[in-house]
Regions:
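N-terminal Rossmann-like NAD(P)+-binding subdomain of aldehyde/semialdehyde dehydrogenases
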Residues: 1-129
Length: 129
């Protein structure tokens, strides 16, 4: 079985400088799955933090409609992940596929709810109890 190496996404670029690979494992059998992820180096983590600091002012200046559209887009992308995603997560976690589908739906629906809150301007007045 060939192992596909997954890289870190930092400021729109792919990076895999770390020598440590985190292997995806079948939770039931313990056998390796065909994915390994590069553990980020300290420099990669620092680069990601710096990229976030640079990106924040631009995101902060967006209008509520743009932020809501961003949240909706994330929800749509999550929903668009097919059965391969569900099966892979089930193998990695040993959770039943129905549970994974439910968790995905819950997450995408929460993102859409947050988008509506932002869209209608309620986000600024909401406070935790």
């Amino acid at each position: 079985m060939s192992i596909e190496h997954r890289l870190n996404h930092i400021a729109g670029q792919l990076s895999g400088n770390g020598d440590v690979l985190l292997n995806s494992v079948d939770a039931h059998s313990g056998e390796p799955l065909p994915y390994a992820f590069h553990q980020a180096t300290g420099d990669e983590v620092e680069a990601a933090v710096q990229a976030a600091e640079v990106a924040y002012p631009a995101y902060r200046s967006t209008r509520p409609a743009q932020r809501a559209a961003f949240l909706d887009a994330i929800a749509n992308e999550l929903d668009a992940l097919g059965d391969d995603f569900i099966q892979h997560v089930s193998r990695e976690t040993a959770l039943p596929e129905a549970r994974i589908r439910g968790e995905r739906s819950r997450t995408s629906n929460q993102l859409r709810l947050f988008a509506e809150v932002v869209r209608w301007g309620r986000a600024r007045s909401m406070r935790a109890a």
